[in-house]
Amino acid sequence: MATPTQRTPIQIVPHFSRLQEWIALDEGFFQDEGLEPMMLADVMHAVSSHHGDEYKRRPQDLPFVQQMEVVNSACQWGTACNAGAEMGKLVPDLYTVGRFAIFSRPGSKIQRLVDLRDVPIGIGERAGSHFTTLQVLEQILPKKHIRTVHTGGPGERLVALLRGEVEAANLLDPEIAIAEARGLRALARGEFLITFWVGPTIDKGVLKAYFRALKHANEVLSLTPEKYMHLWERNVPPALQDNYDYSAFGLGEKFVFEPYTEEMFQNALQFAEKWNLHTYIQDNTYDNLISVTGI
């Protein structure tokens, strides 16, 4: 194994809805690949806990606005739109599948999605919760009766729900498990694609090593999940820390080591355009916005 001075530094924003980055760190998989990981957990918690910052001022945007060489993830729509808005690039070699769920606040009379007609739903603007809420509700409600409110990150959305500040909100992992533990009612559940969102100047060899480490972490998580469930504690934002049964939190995002194709990319952009969420895009050419690693 290379010594710390021989390893290549890499700045990683752990994704709050999975464990693979933490497993790779604790098991030494990054180091085995010649990397010296800098885990930006403060950014992860800021993403989860922000109160509704504007686009390009959100915590997830700032590393890219500041031109840091960072590795992050976002929903497929977000990564595509962000890359098109000159914030990072999309890695097309793989993707993950995450969970979302729309919950109502404690004591709410809302029991079904149809009850959300003209009811503001807490989301993170131009992020996975926003796009998935629109996808779900457009199937049963006229567009003019779908309401969303930019409540902030997923941790902040659950805090707002528990305080009764919003009638309903879209949550991700680990907030889904926390909401369930606190007895909140789920109105809808689903899954969505998450893609890797990286600084445009990161060396391809460094990215390839990073993904090899994540693949190794994914393999050991699949083999002995019970060994790693305690790591969810690291992803719970400070405002929601408690003594949870982390064995009930599940495995988080599922990795799919298959290409995120141009067709998938264009479909994501078309959905964003349908809801007028494409307005920051300067370039929508797939080949210009991807960073191929060849894993």
Where are the predicted features?
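Long, low-complexity, intrinsically disordered polar/charged segments
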Residues: 1-11, 138, 148-169, 294
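Short, glycine-/small- and polar/acidic-enriched structural segments
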Residues: 2-143, 148, 186-189
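Short glycine-centered helix-capping/turn motifs at secondary-structure transition points
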Residues: 28, 164, 183, 276-279
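Positions that flank functional sites
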Residues: 45, 78-79, 176, 194, ...
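Short secondary-structure boundary segments
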Residues: 75-76, 173, 225, 260
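Pocket-lining segment of extracytoplasmic ligand-binding domains
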Residues: 153-235
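Secondary-structure end/capping motifs
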Residues: 204-279
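Conserved C-terminal helix/tail region of periplasmic/extracytoplasmic solute-binding proteins
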Residues: 273-295
